[in-house]
């Protein structure tokens, strides 16, 4: 009887001492799993925060890159200067071509400097004949009104004519060739110059006849 009681007590002590380390181990394992779960959660939140930061930096870089192509005041000034340079270059080329065309033209002994209309089919023209400048009335007939003899006045008239010719920009040559308008003045110039020469010859004859009559009248 006593032996059975001792045996039962021994078994109880054995069970108690054997269960305690198992429970401690289980508790330790439970504590380790909880710690690992918290660590994993912290790492996950840290990764999510880093991803959010990277996204925000990317969006900021993209917005800065999109805002970069905006035109500044310096770019606007450069564009204006480039446009002015192109305009000046075109003007210089056109002026040079006009000057070259005038140099290639044959020398004209008789040249129309300019004129103005004074009525229907009537006008007053300035004609350059050699180094002389004549004021001619053109109507049904051609009459010599005046011969400009002042050298300073002649220089002023010719210089103004040259400036007007040099500053004149013939844009029509770059658009289309006006063949008809180029041929018509060439057809009219011979008849006009011929009539002018005849008028000048008649004027010379009248002057020479007047000089001859003068001495006879004195005799």
Curated annotation (Swiss-Prot):
Keyword Acetylation: no
TM stretches of this protein: 71-96
Signal peptide annotation: 1-26
Gene Ontology cellular component list: plasma membrane
Keywords, sorted A to Z: Bacterial flagellum biogenesis, Cell membrane, Membrane, Signal, Transmembrane, Transmembrane helix
Region (Disordered): 41-62, 200-219
Membrane topology: Single-pass membrane protein
GO BP annotation list: bacterial-type flagellum organization
Subcellular location: Cell membrane
Compositionally biased spans, kind Basic and acidic residues: 41-61, 200-212
Functional summary from the UniProt entry: May be a structural component of the flagellum that anchors the rod to the membrane.
Protein's name in the database: Flagellar biosynthetic protein FliZ
